[in-house]
Amino acid sequence: MASEEASRNSRSRWEPEGRFPRQDKYSVLLPTYNERENLPLIVWLLVKSFSESGINYEIIIIDDGSPDGTRDIAEQLVKIYGSDKILLRPREKKLGLGTAYIHGMKHATGNYIIIMDADLSHHPKFIPEFIRKQKEGNFDIVSGTRYKGNGGVYGWDLKRKIISRGANFITQILLRPGASDLTGSFRLYRKEVLQKLIEKCVSKGYVFQMEMIVRARQLNYTIGEVPISFVDRVYGESKLGGNEIVSFLKGLLTLFATT
């Protein structure tokens, strides 16, 4: 009996029964644009995952003037779950992903920041794994990866999979980032690390995520990885178009020339 008690006490506070340290708080930044159909479900899944794991959290919704009523849905979610758990911090118009994170961090009270897509491409069930990984290695960043272990992509046609794999391969060759999924956007950061990286980054749009990892390598931040399943959005239209692809290629060449 005594040995069992000693064994329980010797474990870290976050390990037993899936519980996590209450002194740590995790702020989820959810930038949204035309996500009225997806937002209620992703928030419900987040609340469920955090509650079941005993994780101290808040969800910050940064809506960029969505014309489809996303802001109205977000206001209802604040009433349902409480203003201490759901914070709506909207902006008047679409101003870019990087500035959305900056805006959200101004209101974040957690010592860790989680960034993810609001379109159900990233399942909150992986978040406890992110946290465990961070604790195990004391990492500055934990990144979800589609290209390692049992990670993968679901719902894409062959053409899009080839484009994604090709883009990731090229970035690995040119930038050598020290992470297997450079363009992913499901990550956990120490708050002060994310603040420092955003100060250093100059890219916008989809290139922003790529530059974050490249700058992290330059600043000698440690990166852990968790394999994830990326699922293509169920509702709404993808925001990745021709302009975004051109911007990605320009951004890649800029990073190659400056890092």
From Swiss-Prot:
Chain sites annotated for binding GDP-alpha-D-mannose: 31, 33, 35, 62, 64, 117-119, 146, 233, 239
Keywords of this entry: Acetylation, Endoplasmic reticulum, Glycosyltransferase, Magnesium, Manganese, Metal-binding, Phosphoprotein, Transferase
Stored Pfam families: Glycos_transf_2
Record carries keyword Acetylation: yes
Protein name: Dolichol-phosphate mannosyltransferase subunit 1
Catalysed reaction equations from the record: a di-trans,poly-cis-dolichyl phosphate + GDP-alpha-D-mannose = a di-trans,poly-cis-dolichyl beta-D-mannosyl phosphate + GDP
GO molecular function, one term: dolichyl-phosphate-mannose-protein mannosyltransferase activity
Positions of Mg(2+) binding: 119
Pathway terms, separated by semicolons: Protein modification; protein glycosylation
EC number(s) reported in the record: 2.4.1.83
Modified residues (N-acetylalanine): 2
General function of this protein: Transfers mannose from GDP-mannose to dolichol monophosphate to form dolichol phosphate mannose (Dol-P-Man) which is the mannosyl donor in pathways leading to N-glycosylation, glycosyl phosphatidylinositol membrane anchoring, and O-mannosylation of proteins; catalytic subunit of the dolichol-phosphate mannose (DPM) synthase complex.
Binding residue positions for Mn(2+): 119
Biological process according to GO: dolichol metabolic process; dolichol phosphate mannose biosynthetic process; dolichol-linked oligosaccharide biosynthetic process; GPI anchor biosynthetic process; protein mannosylation; protein O-linked mannosylation; response to oxygen levels
Compartments it resides in: Endoplasmic reticulum
InterPro entries membership: DPM1-like, Glyco_trans_2-like, Nucleotide-diphossugar_trans
Cofactor: Mg(2+); Mn(2+); Ca(2+)
Enzyme class (EC, first level): transferase
Gene3D superfamilies (alphabetical): Spore Coat Polysaccharide Biosynthesis Protein SpsA, Chain A
